[in-house]
Amino acid sequence: MNTIKKFIHYYGPYKAVFFIDLICAAVISLVDLAYPQILRTMTKTLFTQDKDMILHALPVIAVSLFVMYIVQSLCKYYVTCQGHMMGANMERDMRQELFDHYQQLSFSYYSQNNSGQMMSKLVSDLFDISEFAHHGPENLFISLVKIVGAFIFLFFINKKLALPLIILVIVMFVFSFRQNAKMQETFMENRRKIGDVNASLQDTLSGIRVVQSFANEDIEREKFKKSNEAFLVSKRDNYHCMGGFMSSNLFFQGMMYLVTLVYGGYLIAQGEMQTGDLAMYALYIGIFISPIQILVELVEMMQKGLSGFRRFLDVMETESEIKDADDAVELKDVKGHVRYDHVSFHYSDDETPVLSDISIDIPAGRSIALVGPSGSGKTTICSLLPRFYDVTGGSITVDGKNIRGLTLKSLRSQIGMVQQDVYLFDGTIKDNIAYGKPGATDDEIIKAAKCASIHDFIMELPDGYDTYVGERGTRLSGGQKQRISIARVFLKNPPILILDEATSALDNESERWIQKSLEELSKNRTTITIAHRLSTIRDADEIIVITEDGIAERGTHAELLAQNGVYAAYYNM
């Protein structure tokens, strides 16, 4: 019931459309109910009169019915058009809300959840929700109006024949609700399995170059086949439940016709019912059966819609671990003095410490370099500064202000990152550079590209800055992508800079170009550099050696070589 309440909340902005839609649905149903009763009344009254009276009344009846069906048609148009648009608008609202929430969720959520499943919730789940949002209330309302209306007329025609039909309907609904619980389970499983299919597909397509380079198409085919077959099994279970549900309801509907014919014939034989009334009963049974069939289909639609909505709520009710404090303030006039004060950290799902008692002081405009073996926590130290994760002990300050007391947007807007794994968005080179400063002028973009030593290369391309980079920048080399990402940070112009192994995956020539760009980028900025190639960080103001036990050594390049310790051993390898 709580799920239904939350679902109803999304009708709020469209109340007027919703109620007009229900009124139109009621008109459609009442017109369908009215015709058999009009026919019955005329058969017993008008059509027993003389010829002249019948001919005189027919034009009035024709015009009245014509107007009635025109009104019904207009109502049907509104229900079909505006009703569907209401559902589409709700789908858009939910999708936007879900997308916005995805962007606010912490890194830990993305570490624990599959992007294919997330895309399934954003697309296919919400489509079924849209269909239910429109057709659910409308079909339920139409069906109830027709069922109640038909029963009233059936009682009005013959009470004795109506009683066994009520018993049949009650038995049918009890049976249907029991089947409904089983269907709900299969629909939820169906959702999970199609999410697995999406995840498998995305994983393979994203890594298609690796797949083909290793000639592992058969392995990927088997992986996809496994998830695809699992989805088929879930569909089979689903259809078994649906088959039992549909066939049992069809059986009960047949029993209604059987009772009407046999018991109605008995009542005629007993003189308790007229032959014409039995024919009218058959008409109303048809009207009565139709909404029952709609309700049966509605149950399937409801299960699809609500199972999708529950998955939607699972995400929406997941709170971000990283969010602004109630009294958070904006970070302004940043100098760039960064301080790690006895910082400790472990992941929320693992108590094993990643960092313990780390203290680093970086004066504004100074540079430090972090070196050490993989897994020692270098990237984690950098990830804590923009609050991709929160410290579990100690504190981090920028210009003396605890970062947990700052708004995330203002904090992150003052930090630029250049990473080893460069991500370029689908679009042009210009679009990707401008990502560092939305709304930047062409002159600003060109200046940033020149600073990153990528302008000349761009101008050699046929389309220049309007060159399409391909998905994830597949049309560019690693060095070209890296320089575009550096241009993006130049355009952002942050006072604090994080360089996370920005040159480790490049060839020597590309590294020289990138290193030159990074040196230019680092001027007068507080810079934290992670590097495996120690030759790139010799000029850092301080080099800190991180091991699994914490900070092992710290000092300048010359000082650490003189100590002949861990750093010297790395350098002389």
What are these regions (language model features)?
Residues 16, 107-108, 124-133, 137, ...:
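An intracellular "coupling" helix at the cytosolic face of ABC transporter transmembrane type-1 domains
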Residues 18-75, 155-160, 271-275:
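Transmembrane helix-loop-helix hairpins at lipid-water interfaces of multipass membrane proteins
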Residues 1-32, 47-61, 79-90, 94, ...:
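Membrane-integrated ABC transporters
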Residues 88, 95-128, 199-223, 311-331, ...:
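Short intracellular "coupling" helices and adjacent cytoplasmic loop segments at the cytosolic face
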Residues 13, 17-27, 68, 135-189, ...:
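Transmembrane helices of ABC transporter permease
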Residues 193, 216, 240, 288-315:
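Cytosolic ends of transmembrane helices, especially the final helix of ABC transmembrane type-1 domains
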Residues 331-573:
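ABC-type nucleotide-binding domain
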Residues 64-72, 76, 169-173, 177, ...:
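Hydrophobic alpha-helical segments in the permease module
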